[in-house]
């Protein structure tokens, strides 16, 4: 259910784009992300850093898209967000000694520390590649194809990555 909740702004963006175009879709995505943050704050009293970063990036890049009437800003947003996640994962680990993947998943999984480090790097590389893929699609495909890629391509890539990661992790999980 959380996965669908996380996709809420993207799904609304996609639907609004299909009906009204990129600029209305951008405004819808900003409002949906604001609503998402407000709901999480109301419901849990704490909003994850990743959600705050997502809100900041959508407001800045979505706002630039609307103010300057230039769709390139909203198209760059996923790349900026993915690269910030990649940098954040690596900086937290290697500059501050915190493995954010372990902090997020450590209560659900018991893994050796070197495996957590590999997982952290794998996620950082995955986000870096997603950012590059987004730029490639932005510059080589139509706006409509980019919107489809944003919903289906990145979501599909995420699902495949999680499945492959889960298969890889099975050799490290202890029978309980």
Swiss-Prot record:
- Please give the Pfam families that the UniProt record associates with this protein: IspA (PF04279)
Entry keyword set: Cell inner membrane, Cell membrane, Membrane, Transmembrane, Transmembrane helix
The topology of this chain with respect to the membrane is: Multi-pass membrane protein
**Subcellular localization, as worded in the UniProt entry:** Cell inner membrane
Question: Could you tell me what this protein is called?
Answer: Inner membrane-spanning protein YciB
Q: Which InterPro entries match?
A: YciB (IPR006008)
Q: Which PANTHER family match?
A: INNER MEMBRANE-SPANNING PROTEIN YCIB, INTRACELLULAR SEPTATION PROTEIN A-RELATED
* Function comment: Plays a role in cell envelope biogenesis, maintenance of cell envelope integrity and membrane homeostasis.
Family annotation (HAMAP family):
YciB
Matches recorded under NCBIfam families: ispZ (TIGR00997), PRK00259.1-3 (NF001325)
Query: What is a single cellular component term in the Gene Ontology annotation?
Result: plasma membrane
Q: Give TM segment ranges.
A: 3-23, 24-44, 49-69, 81-101, 121-141, 149-169
Q: What is the lineage of its organism?
A: Bacteria, Pseudomonadati, Pseudomonadota, Betaproteobacteria, Burkholderiales
> Which family does the record assign?
Belongs to the YciB family.
